């Protein structure tokens, strides 16, 4: 389960920001997860709870924002929304797509004290 390692890294980032920005508690974390990133939101919630236990984010809410996948179709020269990596262009059916969004995993916002 790679979500555990992702959450460990996320907590490290939050703790570093707490030292730099001088906050002592995290109330909420807004996390952007791309639809094409192979990250399970429910596994992230479970792992975040386990990794955050006893630390600065122990009681924090994890709000997950699922970001859609997008690609540039080289056949029809359009940006299109896609649900999976190997999907054809929904407009022209072409398979020459360059992923432009949906792979991200980003802490968007923290609510802190």
Curated annotation (Swiss-Prot):
Q: Record-annotated residues binding Ni(2+)?
A: 2
For this chain, one GO molecular function annotation is: nickel cation binding
The record lists Zn(2+) as bound by 73, 76, 89, 92
Protein family: Belongs to the HypA/HybF family.
- NCBIfam families attached to this UniProt entry: hypA, PRK12380.1
The UniProt keyword set, sorted, is: Metal-binding, Nickel, Zinc
Protein name per UniProt: Hydrogenase maturation factor HypA
- Family annotation (InterPro entries): HypA/HybF
A GO biological-process term: protein maturation
| Domain of life where this protein originates | Bacteria
What organism is listed for this UniProt entry? Rhodopseudomonas palustris (strain TIE-1)
Does Repeat count among this protein's keywords? no
What does it do? Involved in the maturation of [NiFe] hydrogenases. Required for nickel insertion into the metal center of the hydrogenase.
PANTHER family (alphabetical): HYDROGENASE MATURATION FACTOR HYPA
